[in-house]
UniProtKB/Swiss-Prot annotation:
Function: Serine protease.
Residue ranges constituting the Inhibitor I9 domain according to the UniProt record: 43-136
Higher taxonomy: Eukaryota, Fungi, Dikarya, Ascomycota, Pezizomycotina
Protein's name in the database: Subtilisin-like serine protease Pen ch 18
Stretch forming the signal peptide: 1-16
Record GO biological process: proteolysis
Alphabetical list of InterPro entries matching this protein: PCSK9_ProteinaseK-like (IPR034193), Peptidase_S8/S53_dom (IPR000209), Peptidase_S8/S53_dom_sf (IPR036852), Peptidase_S8_His-AS (IPR022398), Peptidase_S8_Ser-AS (IPR023828), Peptidase_S8_subtilisin-like (IPR050131), Peptidase_S8_subtilisin-rel (IPR015500), S8pro/Inhibitor_I9 (IPR010259)
Similarity-based family: Belongs to the peptidase S8 family.
GO function terms (MF aspect): IgE binding; serine-type endopeptidase activity
Keyword list, A-Z: Allergen, Glycoprotein, Hydrolase, IgE-binding protein, Protease, Serine protease, Signal, Zymogen
Source organism of this protein record: Penicillium rubens
UniProt-annotated glycosylation sites, renumbered to this chain: 244, 280, 443
Propeptide residue range(s): 17-136, 454-494
Amino acid sequence: MKGFLSLTLLPLLVAASPVAVNSIHNDAAPILSSMTSKDIPDSYIVVFKKHVDPSSASAHQSWLQEVHTAHTGRMELKKRSLFGFDFEAFMGLKHTFHIAGSLLGYAGHFHEDVIEQIRRHPDVDYIEKDSEVRTMSEGSVEKNAPWGLARISHRESLSFGNFNKYLYAEEGGEGVDAYVIDTGANVKHVDFEGRANWGKTIPQGDADEDGNGHGTHCSGTIAGKKFGVAKKANVYAVKVLRSNGSGTMSDVVKGVEWAAEAHIKKSKKGDKKFKGSVANMSLGGGSSRTLDLAVNAAVDAGIHFAVAAGNDNADACNYSPAAAEKAITVGASTLADERAYFSNYGKCTDIFAPGLNILSTWVGSDHATNTISGTSMASPHIAGLLAYYVSLAPAKDSAYAVADVTPKQLKAALISVATEGTLTDIPSDTPNLLAWNGGGSANYTKILADGGYKAHNAETTVEDRIGGIIDSAEKAFHKELGAIYSEIKDAVSA
């Protein structure tokens, strides 16, 4: 009985991490599977060892095609010779990956016999089961003003007087490309002012449009004229999720590759107007070593990356791409300066940004808006803030550069100037940091020199903060009412 108990408890201990399955042969590459996401049957991501170059990868893929074709042929013969025998058709190779020279591999739909041969190939480092990925939104609520913009431009908690006041530098985002790796974008929406572009559709057979709204909402928070943090940035929609808000891990990796290649190509042109690139991924699934490596490779290529921490009120380190160490992982905060009830947390969470009841652009018309919640809404605030800061201090690989600002340096800078200690319900292993845009200053050097800020109200409760907002509103109301009464009294007296 003791042995049985230990075996049944084991999955509970490892459920949060990728585990190797079917690896009974020591000389075979392991197959990784995340216990926190849903695997896609017979779909795999294969990653090469570091010594494999593009030429060797191409030769391997030619070998793979031969193996897959031979297996398919044998199954066809078996089908013809055995009455009533049926077999699933396997697609074979789906994607190849070569991200910034540091991640080579491919994805596809293969029979287990083919996978066994791939596992034994000396070029293969590991195989990961492809899995479902989803958006990180938390459902619709009643529309309200975009308070999130106001919050990141003020140090102290919002009050009635600054509730809708966003302080910003007008040139924020100018010359910066923002890759939104999501469900697509409503590029014709008026809030984008013609700055939104369709980049790439990754899912096979899907339309070049956002049939969901999630990607459009994120894009608006990044770069919309009314709803955006960086109001002059360019948006490039990279569609990796279908209209239902879900997709495959391999499609997401391919989307990251497309963004990295587009950035590298743009940076080599020497365009004086180009200042750098940022990317946002408000999506996630279980732990995926491949996706984390892909994001890290894109950062190494020069893209400033923001990702959502996740909405399970759990440790963000157990989710991808939240666990990608070189990206900025973003948790969600509320109007009352508390951690949103759904927001993930932990040491992999770098910073918090507004994520509850966020108003932004939507689909259905070129004027549509919607209010939704999630770490999906928090991450675009940071992606927009990255674009904002890059435009004030252009990235190193920009021909317009006046400062050496790499993604690593800007991540450190963004964290260093954040507002500290203002949030409640923050676990002890989680940074209590809220994003800040410099309060409207366009002087990047001064923003960094001024450094971070410890909130005066760090010890107050959520109830106190809400009460303060209500008190401020009541005082303003009574003041206005008194002025109206005086005017009426004067008019009557006259």
